Amino acid sequence: MSSPDQNPSDAAGQTGSSNEEVVDVRRGMFGVKGSGDTSGYGRLVREIVLPGSSPRPYGFYFDEIADRLAEALNRDGVEFEDAIEKVVVYRNELTLHVRREALLRVAQSLRDEPELRFELCLGVNGVHYPHETGRELHAVYPLQSITHNRRLRLEVSAPDSDPHIPSLYAVYPTNDWHERETYDFFGIIFDGHPSLTRIEMPDDWQGHPQRKDYPLGGIPVEYKGAQIPPPDERRGYN
């Protein structure tokens, strides 16, 4: 197995993106409103920033991945820019933001091309950016090439009003339960999944608990003889 350079920080373009996107302004420590602030953290104000598109050269082995993927897509009659919204290099890590209609084609090329060979998908992570209008829901796929000892991420977005993303089950079958969990907690519908049902919450549960618009609540719990109130009734810290 080949080994990549051990010091990617020396590569050109590794420092990150040329533009940054402000998607929200967060106030307070935890974003909870309407409760008493006993800590002083309620006065914190900070911008929530996402890295923008990175310029060439990306550095490290990232340019080679982009070039080989572009060649593979071109052979199938797909332009790189039509499949990839942007390429982001941030903190020495490569993320390809993929248009959802091109996700299956991109994933299959990354898996099957001999010079790419990303044989392993490490799952899928859901993210909810409620203030990123039209792109509120994100699915993030970490990929690894065992052959070439390389890593990258695929990131796909969908609007709240149409939370559909193609399932990668056909390309990476081990994503089965990962996509079910992301559906369960974020409400992303993975089209083509063989059995997209809840995996942790009860079947009749209302809502998706890891979304940022999910209400803070709960039920009282008895612990060592004491009655612990649900989170929304406890002492406030913002």
From Swiss-Prot:
One of its GO terms (cellular component) is plasma membrane. Its EC number is 7.1.1.-. It catalyses: a quinone + NADH + 5 H(+)(in) = a quinol + NAD(+) + 4 H(+)(out). It is a peripheral membrane protein. Residues 1-20 are annotated as: Disordered. It is found in: Cell membrane. It holds the Pfam family Complex1_30kDa. One of its GO terms (molecular function) is quinone binding. Keywords: Cell membrane, Membrane, NAD, Quinone, Translocase, Transport. It is an enzyme of class 7 (translocase). NDH-1 is composed of 14 different subunits. Subunits NuoB, C, D, E, F, and G constitute the peripheral sector of the complex. NDH-1 shuttles electrons from NADH, via FMN and iron-sulfur (Fe-S) centers, to quinones in the respiratory chain. The immediate electron acceptor for the enzyme in this species is believed to be a menaquinone. Couples the redox reaction to proton translocation (for every two electrons transferred, four hydrogen ions are translocated across the cytoplasmic membrane), and thus conserves the redox energy in a proton gradient. Belongs to the complex I 30 kDa subunit family. PANTHER family: NADH DEHYDROGENASE [UBIQUINONE] IRON-SULFUR PROTEIN 3, MITOCHONDRIAL (PTHR10884:SF14), NADH DEHYDROGENASE UBIQUINONE IRON-SULFUR PROTEIN 3 (PTHR10884). NCBIfam families: NuoC_fam, PRK07785.1. This is NADH-quinone oxidoreductase subunit C. It comes from Mycobacterium ulcerans (strain Agy99). The lineage of its organism: Bacteria, Bacillati, Actinomycetota, Actinomycetes, Mycobacteriales. The gene is nuoC.
